Amino acid sequence: MKIALLSEKYTPDIGGLAISTERLARLLPSAGHHVYVLCPSPNLLPSEKRTLTSNGVSVTRFGTRKRVDDTLVDWFEIIVEEHRRAPFDVLHAYFLTQAGFVATYAGKYLNVPSVVSIRGNDIERAAFDPARFSHTLYALQNASVVTTNASELVKKAKAFFDRDIILIPNGIDTDHFKPLEQISRLLQTMRLIPPEASGLPSYFGMKQTSPFQLTVGFVGELREKKGLKVLLPAFAQVNQKRPTTLLIVGVVRQGEDKQFFDEFFTLHPNLQIFVTGFISPGDLPHYYSLMDVFVHPSLRDGLPNAVLEAMACERPVVATPVGGVLDVVKDSENGLIVPANDAESLSNAILKLLEDQPLRNRLGKAARETIQKEFTLQKELDLNLKLYKTLRLKD
């Protein structure tokens, strides 16, 4: 089959949307399908279009315009042009709003089945945004199939418009995301880590006041939605009882979030907080293995890739019961669940794990077993292929 994947973000863009779209694009050619990714890019001029093909995936990026509606028109016209050159069998959009609307409308126009995948923010916020409401409703009403990666998002989508929603959880490559104990011990016990000894990028270096100081980690773009204003106060509370390092693998979002972070750091200059900047997905397992505790204190979410990756790396996880987190993290079985927006509960859970190595080990091993059984790449691929085949038979 010839499958078009529409997404507002795609590798090397950062974020869960880019990661998830790229993951499916990479899996489909292994099953014999032809994949065409169509993605807007603010780094290209309006009307500029570039196509790169690698490993069976053709990625076409086109320049965005000042007006969103003009960008959507371009997106639609590119789909029509590509379809007339060599017809698509399925149009699959990642994200309910812009990509979902364009895929659904183009699918109706071209008589091609459309799949719209809800990822999190698209349904969490679009329902309250007048500018996106009509596109969201149109996609939900008219897409051939709607999927999502979290059971909580199924409920929210059905509340928006009552129709069948198919649950397809994210999959994780457990051969790549796995515990790397030797590197973890090396990096945690050295006061200054030489890049040549770690095998990590040259800008990664970490000083510790004690070789026995433990590390709490977060992965992703730290911002208010991801619990920035909860994590930092909780970390300060932890340090009142036990000196600890906070390792942020990723970036802090610019603007108000960065201002809050800088002001917090000014008020707490003695806290050990390290921000790595963007890290290639290929290097992430090394960084997960640095963490004695992984935290994901989101206020809203889909099914966070970072939580699944950390669990696959046998990290004990502390997370909040939002989005699809409860689909994977079972409190006290393979991780700890704390209320969202509650710094005291978060700090208590972190301390509980820092002070109990057997508990950390037990939860970490159970976490990896959960991923290996229920959140595999093969399962994600099989569910999508089953969906495509059903649509093709109906068509």
Task: Locate predicted features.
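Conserved donor-binding/catalytic core segment of Leloir-type glycosyltransferases
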Residues: 4, 147, 188-226, 232-236, ...
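Glycosyltransferase donor-sugar binding loop
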Residues: 43-44, 172, 219, 245-260, ...
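Short alpha-helical donor nucleotide-sugar binding micro-motif in glycosyltransferases
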Residues: 140, 278-279, 286-291
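Carbohydrate-associated surface elements
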Residues: 152, 171
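Short, structured helix-loop element that forms part of the nucleotide-activated donor/catalytic region
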Residues: 242, 247-272, 283, 359
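Aromatic "clamp/platform" in nucleotide-sugar-dependent glycosyltransferases that forms part
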Residues: 299
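Short hydrophobic beta-strand element within catalytic cores of glycosyltransferases
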Residues: 316-319, 329
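Conserved acidic donor-binding segment of nucleotide-sugar-dependent glycosyltransferases
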Residues: 331-332, 336-343, 352-358
